[in-house]
Each structure stands twice: as structure tokens, then as C-alpha cells.
């Protein structure tokens, strides 16, 4: 087995193994986060802009409890606590959101520029204000290039997100906010995180799709609230615990590599 495959397998096993301890020690925090995450759906339109903050706070409650447990921090009541770690994690999530928004804005400009360049090169006299002109310009060979750029942009966006994935673990471990300074921690581990994430999320996707078909078969296809409850339940009671455990495992191996037999630890 190659080193990369071994790292992926180790990360997946660590994530799955961390589910039961996470539920046992942080169940109250996970439940509180799940309930809080449902509130934005009940907000009136005038204050709908607060939905993102509420969602981040809900995730912070859950992640904070799991990271505190992983790094032997204050436990609270079954993980339920809002302290310095949570404030730092909330700041980290907000900063990561800002970074990702800036990256998306830049990529949006790049995608638009490439699409405009392709359209003008394939259609002399191209009118950028006409939907028909856009459709005609991007229906030929130029459509391949115009379609590859958004795909490459999505890949780049995912890569940036994965490179910042260990920022919360570093923040709790060091006791200070780590965002861009944690970028180097994922050097050489990006593929591991990507593949392990796909493997860990697969059961949730399969279950969600299965429940969706079941709802249609028994005539509950219009019960949107049930679908929301299922998605929130999968997120807070499966994905967040296993993903956090996987990230902690990768973080520990990246910060302090395991020594091979016959060698001294650094």
C-alpha cells in the first residue's frame, strides 16, 4: 500500500472511530447546534441577513465542543459551552468565509473575462447585451474552453478550502486565531483530506437519497420540513463529528509526524 493510500485509510478510520466518542462527550452541544441551525428558516425577511451568523454560531457550538474534547480543553455540560475557544472558532469561520468570498469574486471575474473573450473571438461584432448573441457565441468550439474555466475555478476553490481546513484545529491547539498561518499545515495532505472527505460523506449522501426516494414512494414528497430535519440531523450527528475527528488526526500527523522504527522523534 502506498503512503498516500495509507494516509487516506488512516484518516477515514480516525473519522469513523471518532463518531461514538464525539456523540458521547458532546451530544448536548451537537443537539443545541442542530436546533440553532433551524432558526434561520423561521426568520422574517427583514432580518434574513442574520441567517448566516446564526448558522455559523450553530456550527461553532458543535465544532467548539468537539475540538475542546480533542485537545483536552474545558468540557462544559456534555460539550455544551461557549467560551474563548468558541469565540476564536467563530472568528476563524468568519475570516475563512471572507477569504473564500474574495477568491470566488476573483474567479467570477476570470470566468466572465474568459467567456467574453471566447465570445468575441468566435463571433465578430458580438453584442454582450444580447442573450441570443451569448447563446450563439458559446454554442460552438469555444463552449469547451468556456466550460472548462468554471470547472477549474471550482477545483481551485475546493483546494483553497482544503488548505484552510486545519485552521480550526490549529486555533484551538495554540489558543490563538490561525487562518492563513495554518495554510502550510495541509502541505502534502490536501489529496488525503479530499478523498477521505468523499469517503466520509458518502454514507450521508446515500442515506439522504434513499430517504428522498422513500418519501416519494410513501407520498411525502412535499414535506420540505422533513427533508430539512434529515439534512440537519445528518450534518450535526454524523458529518461534523466524523469530519472533525478526521481533521484532528491529520493535524496531529502534520504537526508532529509519527517517527518510523529506528529513528528518533524530532
Q: Model-predicted segments: where are they?
A:
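Interfacial aromatic "cap" segments that immediately flank transmembrane helices
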Residues: 2-35, 80-104, 140-146, 159-208, ...
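Transmembrane alpha-helical insertion/packing segments
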Residues: 5-61, 67-68, 74, 228, ...
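Membrane-helix interface segments in multi-pass membrane proteins
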Residues: 33-58, 104-157, 205-237
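Alpha-helix capping at helix-to-loop junctions
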Residues: 71-72, 96, 100, 112
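Juxtamembrane transition segments at transmembrane-helix termini in multipass membrane proteins
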Residues: 54-76, 123, 163-175, 196-266
Amino acid at each position: 500500500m502506498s503512503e498516500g493510500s495509507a494516509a487516506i485509510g488512516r484518516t477515514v478510520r480516525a473519522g469513523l472511530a471518532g463518531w461514538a466518542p464525539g456523540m458521547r462527550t458532546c451530544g448536548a452541544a451537537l443537539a443545541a447546534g442542530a436546533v440553532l441551525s433551524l432558526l434561520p428558516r423561521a426568520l422574517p425577511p427583514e432580518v434574513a441577513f442574520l441567517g448566516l451568523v446564526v448558522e455559523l454560531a450553530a456550527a461553532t457550538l458543535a465544532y467548539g465542543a468537539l475540538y475542546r474534547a480533542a485537545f483536552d480543553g474545558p468540557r462544559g455540560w456534555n460539550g455544551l459551552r461557549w467560551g474563548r475557544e468558541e469565540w476564536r472558532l467563530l472568528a476563524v469561520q468568519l475570516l475563512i468565509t471572507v477569504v473564500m468570498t474574495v477568491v470566488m469574486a476573483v474567479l467570477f471575474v476570470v470566468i466572465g473575462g474568459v467567456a467574453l473573450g471566447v465570445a468575441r473571438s468566435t463571433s465578430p461584432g458580438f453584442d454582450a447585451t444580447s442573450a441570443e448573441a451569448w447563446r450563439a457565441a458559446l454554442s460552438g468550439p469555444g463552449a469547451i474552453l468556456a466550460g472548462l474555466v468554471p470547472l477549474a475555478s471550482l477545483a481551485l476553490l475546493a483546494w483553497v478550502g482544503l488548505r484552510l481546513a486545519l485552521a480550526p484545529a490549529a486555533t484551538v491547539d495554540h489558543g490563538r486565531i490561525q487562518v492563513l498561518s495554518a495554510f502550510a499545515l495541509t502541505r502534502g495532505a490536501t489529496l488525503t483530506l479530499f478523498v477521505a472527505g468523499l469517503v466520509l460523506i458518502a454514507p450521508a449522501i446515500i442515506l439522504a437519497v434513499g430517504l428522498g426516494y422513500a418519501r416519494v414512494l410513501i407520498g411525502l414528497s412535499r414535506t420540505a420540513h422533513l427533508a430539512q430535519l434529515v439534512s440537519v440531523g445528518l450534518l450535526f450527528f454524523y458529518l461534523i463529528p466524523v469530519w472533525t475527528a478526521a481533521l484532528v488526526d491529520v493535524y496531529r500527523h502534520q504537526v508532529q509526524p509519527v517517527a518510523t522504527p529506528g529513528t528518533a522523534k524530532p
